[in-house]
Amino acid sequence: MDPTVKKYLDDINHLSQQLESSIYLVGGTIRDHLLERPCTDYDFTSSQAPEIARQWAHKVQRTLVPLDETPGHETYRVVLNPNLYFDFTTLQGQTIEEDLAQRDFTINAMAISLPDFIEEKENIIDPFDGQDDLRNQIIRVTLERAFEEDPLRLLRAFRFASTLGFDIETQTLAQIKIHKTKIKQVAQERVAYELLLLLGASRSQLDLMEQSELLEVLFPSIAELKTATRPPSGATLWEGPRNIFEELQSLLLQPDRFLEPHAQWIKGYISKNNHYALLKWSALIRPLMANPTFDATEYLRKFRLSNTAIQFIYRTLKFSEIVLSETHSTGGGFKEDTTVYRFIHRSGNELVSSLLLAFAVRLGNQEDIKYFIPSINRILNFYIEKYLPAQKSPALLDGNVLIRKFKLTPSPRFRFILEKVEEARVLGIIETLEEAEKLASELITSPMELSE
């Protein structure tokens, strides 16, 4: 055990003894401990949890963050650093066993007294045989009423199955199917939070969600696609989007299958800022884009996603369609550096995500990718080898030069000139200030084409 963490635990244990109140580590802390996974979130429960939290936060000189101040259900958090925080929750019921009976799944319904944990005694309190389910890699609900008490648990079952790589026990899956519509009672921001965690897993359990029919409740458009067929094969309209989702998931796991020169760079990109999850979300709602009246931004706002996340999904969908359109010909498209540069400039932060989604669409639709692969690699190579390094160097020309030397004022042409000069610099057409000024003077009187 980390010496710093042990010191924290000793202090908390001492406070609980002073208050004559037993304190336990519970839930995900015990699950991760038994799985030998790194623990960043320590969950405590005690009848005196609020007072222990207040006194300990004061002792370690950290802010006490209230997560829930409902009388009898108080939860407080103390953040020690970005990778370590302690949560203190009031014991539910008179005993730890009563508390555990109110938790969601057997693997989360275990506890150990803090003194035993400190002394590394494996005296696990496990009334629902969670240790057996951990060993057998099974998600099992503690009691059926768990889904009625908090319908978000319907989705959490799949989140844990996805993040841990576990199966959902048959009866639990059946109960989810029975209670599936109750997910509509849950605030959309809570649903979005769980969906992001689920989709952020390397293998999101879409097939299990389909079996329970929860997927169709969360995304009603999928239910419509499942009932519509494509003649003459009779295949449902959902089969294509589902294949695209699976191909995207596979591509994110193994980009070296087709994009070997850039595989490690891509893995680094998708690991940041929820890109992994948001890309999969893009694939899930892509079928809706076929409806000309569909407003992706408004649709995503219903989930209370951040504006940044909404823009990422919207622009990924938009620019992936451009990639598919531009590479539709036998030649593959994007052959000229100028074309590549302009697409990179327009797509911005969503360049890579749009390329990956477009690739998944081609794979999912079982289209010929012989010419598509070189096109995507050509764009990635230009972006990584030329465009990104060029962004680290200052522009040859700025607005001050246009104002001072050419007597221009900020206007659409002003922006047009700066963009064209920057394009020429990145493409290697010009290298010096003199060349930049010469090009600017030519652009002042040339026809103007504003970029999007």
What are these language model-derived features?
Residues 1-452:
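Catalytic cores of the polymerase beta-like nucleotidyltransferase superfamily
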